[in-house]
Amino acid sequence: MKTDFPTITILGGGLLGGSLALALAALNDPPKVYLWVRNPETVKGAKALGISGVTTDLHEAVLNASLVILAVPVGAMEPLLIAALDAGLPAKCLITDVGSIKRLPHQKISHLLL
């Protein structure tokens, strides 16, 4: 399966973020996938599972992203997005999230993107 996004960055290596990274890596023609995590120990575990693009370096993770998936708790989305913008998040990438609610994240981060 070919994706329209050559580089996908997942911010957050918990259950949802890690599962997405594994699913994307398993595609026949996978995009470049970066999985950003805070904890260096998580890097080891993710690499052992076959996620090669796992990193604690936010700049490395977002630099060439065409799609960014926020896979962190809702309360962490705004500060993480600010940090990602400061780290070089491309202006034209698509940003989405895996949160269970949408209004609060939209209210919290829309001013950062306009």
Per-region residue spans from a language model:
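N-terminal Rossmann-like NAD(P) cofactor-binding module of classical short-chain dehydrogenase/reductase
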Residues: V68-I69, T96
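Rossmann-like NAD(P)(H) cofactor-binding subdomain of soluble oxidoreductases
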Residues: L80-L114
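Short, acidic/turn-prone active-site loops that include or flank metal/cofactor-
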Residues: L58-A61, S100-I101
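Short hydrophobic/aromatic-enriched beta-strand-loop microsegments
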Residues: G53-L58, C93-T96
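NAD(P)+-binding Rossmann beta1-loop-alpha1 motif at the extreme N-terminus of oxidoreductases
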Residues: M1-T55, V62
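Glycine-rich, N-terminal phosphate-binding loop of Rossmann-like dinucleotide-binding domains
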Residues: A71-P73, G99
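An anion/phosphate-binding loop that grips the pyrophosphate of nucleotide cofactors and donors
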Residues: A65
